[in-house]
Structure formats: structure tokens, C-alpha cells
Amino acid sequence: MKTHLLVVPSKKTEEVNWVKPLNNYLLSIYGNTLQYQDDINSLNKLRQDIRGVNADDTGLKLYYSYYSKLELIDLRIPFHDLNKSKKLQFEWFDSFSSLPYTQNSLAFEKANVLYNIGAILSRFAQFKYNESQQLNGPEGETAFKQSISMLQQSSGIHQFINKNFLHAPSQDLAQSTIKFLSKLMMAQSQEIFTLKVISGDLNQSKNSLIAKLCKSTSVLYEDCYNMINKNKKEGFKITNESYDGNDYEDDLDDDDCDDLEGFLERPEDTEDSDNRYVAAELDSSWISIIYFKYEYYKSLAYYFNGLHLDANRKYGDAIAYLTKSQEVLNGVHSSTLKQVSKGSGDVYELLDNYKYQKDAVTIRLNDLNKDNDLIYHDIVPNLVTLPEIKPMDSTKIIKLGDNAMFHEINEKNYNNFLVNVVPVNIHELSSYYSEEKSQYLRNEIDHFEVSNEEVSSVLEYLKLPKALVSIKESLRGTSSKGNTRNIDELLSQSVIDKVNEISSQYSNDIQRKNTIENSRKEIYQLIKFLTENNCQDDAIQLKKILYDASVSDTKLFALVDETYHQTLGKGIQSTEFKSLFKTVDNKSSNQDSEISLLDIIDDDDDDNTNQDKQIKNIEDYLNDLNNIKQAKFKLIEKLKKEIHNDDISDILVLNMKLKSTNEIKSIIFPEELKKFNPFTNELDKLITNEKSIIEQLKSRWNQLISNPQIKNLQTETNSKNRLIISQSEKIDQFYGNWLKYHNGLIAGEKFYNQLLDQFKNFRNNIDNQLNQGMRSLNIGQQFPTQPMLNRTQSSGLQSNYTGQSSISHSGSLSGQPSGGYNQPQPQQQQLQQQQQQQQQAQFSGAYNQQYSQPHGGYTQFQGYGQGQGQSQTGYQRQPPPPPPQLPPKQSMGSYNFATTLQQQQLPPQQQQQPQQQRTPQNESNLIYDNPSTYNPNMYNFFSSK
């Protein structure tokens, strides 16, 4: 079966130029319109193209694209500002009466564009329906489905116009007309679907379903027919219904539509009673076709319901419904059929269907009456008492927002048309919303950080996981036995480096110390030599130097403990060093612990198993806490990303004309922030789980450390740790003293070597001078057999080497003894004075400068720099030589300790200052000018008995 579909006529329009008004507005706002020229030109071209489109996909895309851009202009540009300089005039013609209507309202332009979209959809649906009747197979099925979809979309377009555009200036845009067209599209969609089912039910197994579908189609056409003015219907003699006198009067005037804002009023306004009738001038064929279909499908509903009852052996009811169907068909007035025939297109299909159905009902009814009279004798109910058939709707309206083609085009235009044009108030609202998001994120981050701090505090208080690792090592026997762990695992790297440095220098330190002691002994032997050779002054000075050096050596050696130094000197891998870190229990209770373990080995196995389980549980809790921490971190990072990428400018633009600023802030913003609630809920869930794990961890940990064996292990571990800390501090302290000790040994070794070398040279000079003096006696070569001098001569010679000996501590001789020896030549005297000055400079600064190290090694020797001043003038020969006399004992103040201590506190430069001022010309201070207080035993104090 095939039907005739009514097509909504399209509206015609005049040309509109968008270029100049848009350029003027954008230039006034942004100062440059170069980047918007493509968008403006494309909009203007679309406006021209829609004037002559065909009813196909291309025409629909052009109209959808133009309407989408109109919506974007309405959202992004205040249209009243756009119309200030040069107003846009939109002229459209009524689709039924062809009357022109002109307005400068953007809403008027959008409403007319939408109307034409609905008209194109209805025409395109008719084309697809006719195509489906000509094609077979999948292609015909696809065309049929597209036809139904387009009729539903057209109904949705008209419904959108009805809800969003009120007080239209033209009759075709009036609310009543739009409602009528929307209902008509739904009726035609239901109709072609019903006919499709009838054509497919060759076995007549769906008569009940078809009856309900036909009833729904009849109801829809009835609604459309009831929306037509009674005066128009009476002209065709197709109704007998009473008329209440409230005829629809179309007295709208163009002047009544000057209010542009009124065109955008919401549909909540109360409808006037006159708006129930169609305002448009409908064609007479439309009215007759709608009425015909209303009656025709009502008849079909009765007919198929009768067939259904006949199949169920309800012959009386079947005869009643067939009779009802026949009455409806016979009730169609001939004038109606005549008006239908005047319609355009394939209206003859309707008349053919009518004739066929009328004959089919008559034949079927006659056969059924005959069978009932002869065979069934079923009672035929009264037609008035027949129950009405329940309608079944098979189609639904497809809204504009659900239109796939429009949605795709709208998304494309939104991202490409006037993208950077955003109203200032939208920017302000976006900034406010960004602050709301930032505050939301800060709250969640604070929640996250506080939870992490709580976990860290708990773990720090419980000393986890470090304490757990210590317990595990203790249970495995690696922590309770200090000697089983490598020593480098117990100590810090700095302590190990210090011990390695001490051990690497230990042999050198011992060698230097022995060298110092041996040198001191050898120098002591030199003192005996000087005493035996009557060089008492030099022996005294040398003893003084040696005494001060010994005192300094004693202080230096006292810096380190030899036993501890020996232990560290053997290195960190030595047994002695490792023994420093053994606790008392390790040293004294090994045997007892072994016996205890052998006695209670079975109990220990059970305890260890239980402890291992507890430790495993605690490790699992710690691992869970770490996983939760990572999950929280990832969740916060994801929340940051989502908040950063969130942009509700589109929503703000769409709602700016519908809601006030306060409504947007109080309603839309909280609603938009709810999209982040899943992150908040997940974070709360993780933190709650985290707190539960912490409580369980505390319980398990307290249970573990309350075990007596664990307590003992912790006690031993704490003792071990304290011992390690104590020994590390002791090593650090020892290392500081050892640096002074090590540097002092280096300086002392050098000093003693120089001192020993000088006095060895001095002894050699004495031997050479004695030999030279003996040769000057002209006794020949028999030096050992020379006759002894008499006591007077011997006394005079002794006085020359004791009282008047001016040999300095440097070890050089500056003159010959008085008593008959040959006088030295002037050249020899000059050479001896140079040697004396050089040796004096060496001894005055060598030890003091080299022995005083930055680390506090050797201190300055007392009295060493004082003996030099007197020795510089001792070897001046005075003619005639006076008797040898020693100065008074109190004149040896240059050797007392008070003076040397005072001089020791001065810098080396100031200590040498008085020595440099003394010259050989100061003869009044020589020991020879003082009265003799010689005591032969006064020098025996330092001599060995």
C-alpha cells in the first residue's frame, strides 16, 4: 500500500549582506578584523546559498551550517550592538500566503531558517518514501527508514520553533500553525510505518497490532483536523460539530512585532484561546486529505480488529467491527473525495486505497454474515456498545539537539567560526569559575598533604620501617652478633675513612717516634762527650734544648692513647678493631645463649614462625600504606589535570541569556564543580582505608614488640647502636688528636735530625781543633805519648775550654784557647765568624719554625733562643788575657724558665729580635767582665755521675 504525503512549503527570502555590520562591530571592539574575514565571508555566502537549495543532503547541510553560525553570533556578539551603525533587515515571505515580513531581529531570522529546515525535511522525506516504494531489498528498506527519520526530525524542528519563538509576525510561524505542522509530520510518520506493517503481514497474523497502529494514525490525523478552523472545514461539508463562536481571527499587524525582545519570550506564557486553530491559510486539499485520512484509518482500525476477532472465532464481534468500518467509509462525503482528487502529486493513491478498502470490507462482511447465519449463529452486539480500540504510537519526535547532522555541523562551526570572539562578561565569569576550581583543588591538596603528614608522624613515632628491619636482622642472627656483620656496614663512611688513614700511617708514626727517642739518646751521649771535653757551656745549652724538647715530646706523646692507637692502626678488618664494637652480651654470654637455644629449640621454632608471620603482616601494612600514598598522589595529579583542562565557556555562553549572573554563580558553578566529586570521593575512600591500616599496624606492632624475645633483641640492638655511636665519637675525637700527633712527629723527627747533625759536626770540629792544637805544640807526631802539663798549665787549659769557652750550641768554634796556642789567621777568624752566624740562624729558627705546626704539634722549646745571644761574643780574644772566671750564678738568667716562657709566648720574629740587636761590640755583658764566682761542681747538675 502507498499513500500521499503532504509537504510543508518553503519560505522565500531576500538577500542580506552580513559583511559590513560584522566588520564595523569587530573593528570597534578588536581594532582589526583581518583574522575574521574568512568567517564573515563564509557566513555571507551561506546566506546567499540557502535561497535556492534543493531538498537533499546538501541543502540540509547549508541550512544547518547557517543556523549554527546564527546561534554562534547570538552567543558571541550582542546583536543590538551589531545593529547600531547599520541595521540588518531580514525579509521573509509567508509560505502559505506569500506575504512579505521584514524585521531586524536575529530571532526572526533564526525562526525562518528553522522553518525552512523543517520544510526541506518534509519534502526530502516524501522523496525518500517514494524511492522506497520503487526499490526493493536493503536499498528500499534504507530509504524507508530515512523517510520516517526525516518526518520525525521535521516534527522536532517545528516543536523547537514552538517552544523558543513566540509572537511571530507571520502566520506560518504562529504557534498554532507550528503545532499543527509538528503534529502533521508525526501523523505521516505513523501512517507510512502502519502501511509498511500492513504490506508485510501477508499471513494476516498481526491484525490486532495493525488495528492499534491504524487507530493511532487516525487519532493523530484527528488532532490535526481539530486544529483547523471550523469555518474552513464547513466549506467542504465535512463536519457537523457545533461551533462555540470563538473563531480564530488573524489580526496581527506588522507594527505589533516591533518589540524584538518579545520574540524571544519563553513558552511559559499563557496561551490565548484563539491560538488553538491554525493561523496559516491552508490549501483546501490539505484539509480534505487530513479529514480523509482521519476517517480512512479509523475504518482500517475497525476492519483489522474485526479480522482479528474473526480469527479468534468471535464472529458476532467481528461482524460488528466490520459493520462499523463500513459505516465509516460510507460516511466520507463525496465533496471530500472531490477535494482530495484536486490535490497535487499522487493523491490518486488515496482514492484507490479507499475504493479497494470499501470493496474489501463489503465482501468480508457479507461472507461473515452468511457464515454466522448458517453456521455460528453468534449474537452481533450493538455498535454503540463496542469498546474503542487502544492506539499504539510507533514513532517519536527527534529533537533538534538529537539530530546527528546538525550536531556534527554545529561542533565544527563552534571550533572554527569567530573562535576568539567572546563577550567580556563571559571572561569575567570564567575567571570567577577558575578561582572556584583553584579553591576546590587547594582543599583537596591540603586534605592529601595532611593525611601524608599523619602517616609520616605515626611511622616516625613507631620508628618504622627502620625498627622492623633491625628486628628482622636480629632474628636472623645478623644483628645480635656484631662480629657476623661487616664492620663497614656498622660505621659511617667518614669514620671508616679516618680509621683507614690512621692505619695507613701507623707504621710511619711508630718509626718516627722511635727515631725521636733514638735521636734523643744519641744527643744525650753527645752531652757526655762535651762534658768530658770540658765544653760545659755548650753541654748546658744542649741539655737545656734537650730538656725542653723532651717536655714537648712528652706532651706530644700524651695526645694519643698508645693502646687505642695500636688498635686503630691494625685496620677495620682486624680482630682488635672489631672487638671495640662487641657488646657485653656478645663477649660474656655466648656459651649460655648457645645452651639456652639447645634447650628450647622447639619453642624457639614456634616463636620464630609466629614472629615471622607478625613481621610479614606489618610489612604488608607498610606496603599497603605506600601503595595508598602513591594512589593518592596519582589521583591528585589527575585532578590537577582535569581542573586545568576544564572549560565551561560554552556553558556560560549558552546560559548567559537564560540566567542572571548570580544564578550562574549559585547554580551552574556548583553544578559544574560536581564533576570533580568522583576524585574527592576516591580520595576520601583512600584516606579512610589508610587510617584503618594505621590502626591495624599499631596493634600488630605493639603485639610484636611486647614479645619478650623481641624486647631482648631490641635491648641488644639499642646497646649495639649506642656502642657504635660512642665508638664513632671516640674515633672522631681520637682522629683530631692524632692529626696533631702525626704532624708533631714529622716536625720532631726533622728537628732531632737537624740537631743531631749539627752537634755531630760540632763534635767533629772539636776533635779537629784538639788535633790541631796538639800538632801546634811541636811535639812531633807522638800525640798519645806527650808529657802531661803541670797543674797550672792544665788548669789554664781547662779554663780555656770551660770558663772561657765560647763555643756556641751551633757546634762551631770561634777562637783558640788562651795559653800559648798559636793565634788563628785573620782569614780563619772571619771564616769562623761566618760559620757561627749561619749556625746561629739555623738553631734560632729551625726548631721553632718547623716544629710549630698548625695542628698544635711541637711547641717552642724553652731557653733555646736565649743561649745564642751570649755565645756570639764569647770567642773574642782580649790582650792581655785575664784569668778565666765564670760569671755569677745569677747572671745565667738567660737560661731561666721564666724568661724562656715569656719568650715562648711571643712570635718567632719577636723572639729573634733581641738576638739580632746583640753585637760582638757589647763587651760589657760578656761573662769575662764579671767577677769570678766559679764553683767547680755547679755544672755537675746535668752530668751523669
UniProtKB/Swiss-Prot annotation:
Domain BRO1 residues, every copy: 4-455
Superkingdom of this protein's organism: Eukaryota
GO cellular component terms, A-Z: endosome; ESCRT III complex
Main localisation: cytoplasm
Low complexity compositional bias, start-end: 803-877, 899-921
Coiled-coil spans in chain: 606-643
Positions of the UniProt region annotated as Disordered: 786-945
Name listed for the protein in its UniProt record: Vacuolar protein-sorting protein BRO1
Organism: Candida albicans (strain SC5314 / ATCC MYA-2876)
